[in-house]
Amino acid sequence: MSDVKYFEDTEFGLIEAVATIDNGDFGTRTIRFETGQLARQADGAVTTYLDDDTMLLATTTASNQPREGFDFFPLTVDVEERMYAAGRIPGSFFRREGRPSTEAILACRLIDRPLRPTFVKGLRNEVQIVVTVMSMNPEDYYDVVAINGASAATRISGLPVSGAVGGVRMALVVDEKHPEGQWVAFPTHAQHEQSVFEIVVAGRLVERKRGNKTFSDVAVMMVEAGASENVVNRVKDGAPAPTEKIVSDGLEAAKPFIDILCRAQEGLAQRVGNAAKEFPLFPPYTDEVYSAVERKVSKKLASLLTLKAKQERDDATNAYMEEIEAELLPKFEASYSSAAEASKEIRAGYNAVMKAIVRRMILTDHFRIDGRGVTDIRDLAVEVELIPRAHGSSLFERGETQILGVTTLDMLKMEQQIDSLAPGDAKRYMHHYNFPPYSTGETGRVGSPKRREIGHGALAERAVLPVIPSREEFPYAIRQVSEALGSNGSTSMGSVCASTLSLYNAGVPLKAPVAGIAMGLVSGEIDGKTEYVALTDILGAEDAFGDMDFKVAGTADFITALQLDTKLDGIPSKVLSDALEQARDARLTILNTMADVINGPDEMSKFAPRITTVKIPVAKIGELIGPKGKNINALTEETGANISIEDDGTVFISAADGASAEAAIEKINALANPQLPKVGERFLGTVVKTTAFGAFVSLLPGRDGLVHISKLGNGKRVEKVDDVVKVGEKIQVEIADIDNRGKISLVPVVEED
C-alpha cells in the first residue's frame, strides 16, 4: 500500500518525508525527500532519493529585486549531470563536465513545463532551479525524480506557488505473468525493456466539490509519452497495442502516485515551516485598462479575426492595436511613470481582449480564425526527392507550416557516441530539428540549437523510432534533419510526417508509416455549464489562446508518441478520450495523403553508401585487423571500402559501388575462412618487405611468402634485392613449397615468349 511517513532529527535539523510507491507484483519503490543538511543558503534545498542509490540535490533561489524591463517571468531550470554519480571520469579532453547533455536539457524541460504555471502571475524576480545528479543507479531514470525534487525545493523556499507538483514515469510492462500489461511506476531499465509504452505524467492536487463535500483530486499538467523501440514486434507477438484507450488508462493509473508524492512534499513544507515571502507583482494590465480596451474593440476586432491568411490577419490586428493605443494613451499616460509603461499595458490588455473574443467564439459558435470547422485539417501538400544529392528528402506542408525533411545514411560507426548518465553508449537513429527565425518572418540568432529545438527534435525522434528497422535488417546509421521553413502551428508534428516521407525516399524499410497532429482544447462556462471544444490541427494563435495543447503521433494502429500541456485543473476522462479519437481521425487522413505520394521504401540513392555484412569467427577478428590495424588498413586501401567490425564477428562493409564491396568481401572471406594455398598456385602479390636474403610478398591478407634472393635473378646472381624489386611493387609468383610450419616459399613467374 502506498504511504507517506515523516522523520525529524532536531539535533541536526534534518526533516524527511518518505513516500512508498506500491507496484503490486513488481514490488515497491521509495521516494525520500530530505532537507536541512545540504545547501543551507539556498532559499529551498531538498535532497531526493529513489530507493538508496539514486540521489539528486535540488535547490531553488530567487533574486532580491525584480528584473526591470522584463514582461515575463524569468525562471531558469538547470540540470547538472555529475559523472561521479556513476563512478566515471568524463570522456572530454579536460576530463570535466562541459555543456549539458541532451538528456539533461530534456530533463530541464520536463521540470519547467509543470512548475512554471504554479508560480503566481506577475512575478518578475529571477528564480533559478538547479538540480544536481549526485548518485545514479544505472538501472534508474533520474528525470522524474528531478521533477519531484525541484518541486519540493520550490515548495519550501517561501516563493509564491500554488502547490506541489508530483511527477511519475509509468511503464506498461508485459510479461508472461501479465500478458495484458501492468502499469509500473518508476520502472527500471530492465522493466523498460519489457514494456510496450512509457508515459511521464506531472500533476498537482486541487480541491473539488461534490455536493456539500470537498475532496482532493489530481489535476494533470503535463504528459510526455512514447512507445518502446520494439513495440511493433511485441504487438505482433500478442502484447497490447498502445491505443488511445491505453494512453487514457495510463493517465488514470498515474494519479494515485502523483497524489502521494504531492502529499509528501506538502507535509515536508509544513514541517519546515518557512514563512511565505512577499514579492512585488507586476500584472500585465489593470482591470481599468482591460475594460477600456474591451469597450472600444470588441465588434471590429471580432471581424478582423475572421481574416484567413495569417500575415494579413496579423497585420490588420496589429494596425488596429496601434490605433487603439493612440486613442487610449492620453487617458492613461498620467497614471504611469512613462508613456512607454502605459503603452505596454494597453497592448497587453488588447491581446487579452483578443484572446477572450476568440475563446468565446470557439465555445459558442465553434468558430476558428481561419474559417475551418473544429475537426478540419488545413490543406496538405506532400513532395519527395527535392534535394539532388541527399540520400532522401521530402517537403511536407500543412497550411502555412512547411517542413523540409532530409535523410542521410552512413556506416554504423557514424552512430552518435553518448557520454552521459543515460543508459546506452550509442544512438543509431538521430533526429535533429532546426527552427530558423525566418520561419516566422522574423530576425534572430542562428547557430547552435536552443532547448526548444532539442525538445522538438527529441519528440519527433521518439515518434519515429519504434518503426525504424533493426540493425540486422538495415545496417545503417541514420540521421534525420527537419528544417522548419515556415511555422504556423506544430512544426514538431510536421517534422514527424516529413521524416516518414524522407526515410521512405531514402530507401529505409520502415515497419509502418508515422504521422502526427497537434490538437487544442478550449473550455469555459456557457449558460452555467462547462463546455469543452477540441480543435484539430491548431494554429499558432490557437495554441496561445487555448487551455491545453497536445501532440499525438502514431501509425494507423497505435500511438508512438504524445506530448500534452494544460492550464486546466483537470480534464474529464471522456473529454480527453474524445480528443484522442479526434486526433486519430486526423492522423489517418494525413497518412492517406502521404501514401498517395509514397507508400513504401524507394530504391536507395546512387549517392548513398552500399552496406553489406559478412560474419567471421570471433577468433579471427584480431587476424583481420592485424598488428596496429595493418590488415584492415590494407584492405581499405586496396578495395576503397570502409570496414567496421563488431564484437560478435559481424563485419560491415560500406562501398560506393558493388565492385569495391565484392572485392572487400572476397578478401575478408579469404582471411576469415582460410584455405591453405597449395603448391603450384599462382598469385599476383605485393612486395611488403625486402631483406638481405629475399623479398616477402603478400598473397592474401595475413598470408605472406618469401621469394629467396637466389630466385630473383632469373638464373643470374643478384647482389641486392632492391635492385630487382621494391616494396609496394606487384609481382606474379608461384608457390614452390610449404614447409611443415606453414611457411611459404615462392618463385617469380617468368612469362614465356
From Swiss-Prot:
Residues 680-749 form the S1 motif domain. It comes from the Bacteria. GO terms for cellular component: cytosol. SUPFAM superfamilies: Eukaryotic type KH-domain (KH-domain type I), Nucleic acid-binding proteins, Polynucleotide phosphorylase/guanosine pentaphosphate synthase (PNPase/GPSI), domain 3, Ribonuclease PH domain 2-like, Ribosomal protein S5 domain 2-like. One of its GO terms (molecular function) is polyribonucleotide nucleotidyltransferase activity. Its cofactor is Mg(2+). It catalyses: RNA(n+1) + phosphate = RNA(n) + a ribonucleoside 5'-diphosphate. Its main location: cytoplasm. GO terms for biological process: mRNA catabolic process; RNA processing. PROSITE patterns: KH_TYPE_1, S1. Gene3D superfamilies: GHMP Kinase, N-terminal domain (3.30.230.70), K Homology domain, type 1 (3.30.1370.10), Nucleic acid-binding proteins (2.40.50.140). It is found in: Cytoplasm. Residues 609-668 form the KH domain. Keywords: Cytoplasm, Magnesium, Metal-binding, Nucleotidyltransferase, RNA-binding, Transferase. It is an enzyme of class 2 (transferase). Its EC number is 2.7.7.8. Mg(2+) binds at residues 543, 549. InterPro entries: ExoRNase_PH_dom1, ExoRNase_PH_dom2_sf, GPSI/PNP, KH_dom, KH_dom_type_1, KH_dom_type_1_sf, NA-bd_OB-fold, PNPase. It holds the Pfam family S1. Belongs to the polyribonucleotide nucleotidyltransferase family. Involved in mRNA degradation. Catalyzes the phosphorolysis of single-stranded polyribonucleotides processively in the 3'- to 5'-direction. NCBIfam families: polynuc_phos (TIGR03591), pppGpp_PNP (TIGR02696), PRK11824.1 (NF008805). This is Polyribonucleotide nucleotidyltransferase. It comes from Corynebacterium glutamicum (strain ATCC 13032 / DSM 20300 / JCM 1318 / BCRC 11384 / CCUG 27702 / LMG 3730 / NBRC 12168 / NCIMB 10025 / NRRL B-2784 / 534).
